[in-house]
Amino acid sequence: MWPAPAKLNLFLHVIGRRADGYHLLQTVFRFIDRADTLRFEPRSDGEIVLATPIPGVPTDSDLTVRAARLLQQASACRQGATIHLDKQLPMGGGLGGGSSDAATVLLALNHLWQTGLTRPQLEKLGLTLGADVPVFVHGHNTFAEGIGEAFTDIELPPQSYLVLHPAIHVPTAAIFGAPELKRDTPPIRHGEWQPGQGHNDLEAVACAKFPAVAEYLNWLKQHAPQAMMTGSGACVFAGFASRREAEAILAQCPADMNAWIADGLGEHPLAKIS
């Protein structure tokens, strides 16, 4: 089994916009121990088969299939694979699940097919699939800039996170495309950032467009003022120095709130695979 861990954005600032429409960001990616898992069966016919398709997602559009085919093309590999995906991370939750799945496909099949691509080469491939994919391939908690492709490793203290997931899908494009999105937060230098500093510029737009996000975030902030949204939503979270603190807040969650605790990781579980 090959893990594809979730990420949290410990802050997310939009500091500008390029002429081509891409937004310039600053953020810290933190891997957590909540994950999808993948399993691969080698095939000699060169076919890429997704044994566990996601309802509503055409197979050819699925990031796992696209990642596998991209690796085949880049490496001239004639082998194939049947992909089994155990999907635990919500789609449209801001946890990077699809990007993480794609990164794990690149890392796993590069290893299993023995294609010999380096991690920087896999990061370049990943960027063509999505802006977050290279960070998952890279394998370390990072301070990321640009459109997410420029990053610096960062050491983070151990923390436990209480994550609340409103049962909705927040489309990233709807948040970044909103005219009211704040796009001029002053940039900070990565060496000056400290845990707990910063905010998520996408939060106000997501809360206005999706009342469930606002409801969950407001509830969590009443119990943990440091709470914020991750990515473009829908999940919100709060970090704690100990798991016991997170469990105390979890115990107060209304029964109809989807909530869980995850621990921060020092690095991606596949950080040392080659």
UniProtKB/Swiss-Prot annotation:
Protein name: 4-diphosphocytidyl-2-C-methyl-D-erythritol kinase
Pathway where this protein functions: Isoprenoid biosynthesis; isopentenyl diphosphate biosynthesis via DXP pathway; isopentenyl diphosphate from 1-deoxy-D-xylulose 5-phosphate: step 3/6
Superkingdom, natural source: Bacteria
Binding-site list for ATP: 90-100
Name of one Pfam family that matches: GHMP_kinases_N
EC code: 2.7.1.148
HAMAP family: IspE
Keyword Hydrolase appears in the UniProt entry: no
UniProt similarity note: Belongs to the GHMP kinase family. IspE subfamily.
The protein's role, per its UniProt record: Catalyzes the phosphorylation of the position 2 hydroxy group of 4-diphosphocytidyl-2C-methyl-D-erythritol.
Organism: Dechloromonas aromatica (strain RCB)
Matches recorded under InterPro entries: GHMP_kinase_C_dom, GHMP_kinase_C_sf, GHMP_kinase_N_dom, IspE, Ribosomal_Su5_D2-typ_SF, Ribsml_uS5_D2-typ_fold_subgr
Catalytic reactions of this protein: 4-CDP-2-C-methyl-D-erythritol + ATP = 4-CDP-2-C-methyl-D-erythritol 2-phosphate + ADP + H(+)
Catalytic residues (positions): 7, 132
GO BP term, example: terpenoid biosynthetic process
A GO MF term: ATP binding
Keywords per UniProt: ATP-binding, Isoprene biosynthesis, Kinase, Nucleotide-binding, Transferase
